[in-house]
Design a protein with these regions (language model features):
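Active-site rim helix/loop that mediates acceptor-substrate recognition in acyltransferases
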Residues: 96-102, 266-293, 302, 308
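Asp-based, Mg2+/Mn2+-dependent phosphohydrolase catalytic module
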Residues: 1-6, 88-91, 113, 117, ...
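Conserved GNAT acetyl-CoA-binding A-motif
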Residues: 180-183, 352-364
């Protein structure tokens, strides 16, 4: 089902605090210019966590209430950090500045407007789903993106926060679309899981300093990368963080993944399945690299030395004993088009170069266009097309090192 709409969170998805911190604004820094010298970072984090936890429990549905609650939050910050010597006037001034001076405190992430305009130009409808307060309307006016938006869903108006399903249902009702026709972009994986439960496809925004990819969702470091993902051009996930060498204990998961992948192929002839015994031999030889995300085997690949009689070079009659055969790559259907195939190609090339090998070889079904594109994008060259694997036709590829 074609997706027709994109919903966005605001904070660290489309917008950011100019100071780098939602609570420690420029006004705060002006009032307490030495706070970084006087207060240990861990102590500040703990104090902010207490104030933010209190804010999360408040019913903030008017600007006056927002101002009052923010003032109390800054009082709590001052009480927890006596080195600040925060006065009542300080708390009130910082809170009022945060509510009223949107331009000075918040900004769109670079490229946000252009990304939204691109999506609108492609016929996408756009909406916001945000845990936020009434001053958000001022922010959107200052950002100048209201004309690009078709729907607005705010936690303060509904009295619930993400990942409560009522947030997503409200947004979908405004759009008049099922979740299966929508994307949702947020920086928090828990919120993406809530949207996914209603059929939306999630993208994790990782623009915030120190953000780490969850792995279960495509990751975007910039608004433009969100557009790229929606257009099917991979994502910014660093798969090396999730890579492991597989062991005998992983064999059942390997077999299950092989079955899932084969069942999802457009043509079953694209892949020649292996037995568990064959996989066991490769695992025992230490040749199987996997991608594990939150305990789930998302993908694995196998590369073996190419010096034997059954090597791809030998099959083609090429005298190239110092080569590497890229034998298998399997990616769960849930993780397709996420750059994992290309990650394994780059990994095995790096290993082959470290061993001073002369070339890498692989075979691909000539009709398997996604795999062909991955190989050719990585600089592999087609040598020939011939029968292999019980009569199945395969294109043989080589990359010189």
């Amino acid at each position: 089902m074609e997706r027709q709409a994109v919903f966005f969170d605001l904070g660290w998805t489309l917008a950011a605090p100019r100071s780098g911190d939602w609570m420690l604004t420029q006004c705060f820094a002006q009032r307490f210019p030495r706070w970084r010298d006087d207060i240990p970072a861990a102590q500040m984090v703990q104090a902010q966590a207490l104030a933010n936890a209190w804010l999360d429990q408040q019913n903030i549905n008017t600007l006056d209430r927002e101002l009052a609650c923010l003032t109390q939050a800054y009082r709590m910050l001052g009480d927890a950090l006596p080195a600040l010597s925060m006065t009542e006037a300080d708390a009130q001034t910082i809170a009022r500045d945060r509510v009223e001076h949107v331009q000075e405190n918040f900004t769109l992430l670079p490229g946000t407007r252009e990304a939204l305009e691109t999506l609108r130009g492609q016929g996408m409808r756009l909406g916001i789903i945000s845990d936020t307060w009434p001053s958000v309307h001022k922010q959107l006016e200052v950002y100048g993106i209201l004309p690009l938006l078709d729907s607005l869903t705010f936690s303060y108006a509904l009295g619930v926060r993400k990942p409560d399903e009522r947030m997503y249902r409200h947004a979908l009702a405004q759009m008049g679309l099922p979740g299966q026709q929508c994307w949702f972009v947020d920086d928090l994986p828990g919120n993406l899981l809530g949207a996914q439960a209603l059929g939306m496809r999630g993208i994790q925004a990782v623009a915030a300093p120190g953000s780490v990819e969850d792995g279960r969702f495509p990751a975007a470091r910039t608004p433009q990368r969100m557009v790229d993902i929606i257009q099917g051009h991979g994502d910014d996930t660093d798969w090396s963080r999730f890579r492991v060498q597989l062991t005998e204990a992983d064999l059942p998961a390997m077999m299950a993944l092989q079955a899932d992948m084969a069942a999802a192929l457009p043509n079953p002839r694209w892949y020649f399945t292996s037995s568990q015994e064959e996989f066991a031999g490769e695992v025992a030889a230490g040749r199987v690299q996997g991608i594990r995300v939150h305990g789930e085997l998302a993908a694995f690949a196998i590369a073996a030395p190419g010096g034997g009689e059954g090597s791809y070079a030998a099959i083609l009659g090429r005298d190239e004993p110092h080569s590497l055969d890229f034998q298998d790559v399997m990616v769960s259907p849930a993780y397709r088009r996420r750059g994992i195939h290309s990650h394994f190609l780059a990994l095995f090339e790096q290993q082959a170069r470290a061993q001073q090998l002369t070339a890498m070889y692989a075979t691909v079904d000539p009709d398997n266009l996604p795999s062909l594109r991955s190989f050719e994008k990585a600089g592999w060259k087609r040598l020939t097309v011939r029968s292999a694997y019980a009569g199945r036709i395969r294109a043989y590829y080589r990359k010189a090192l």
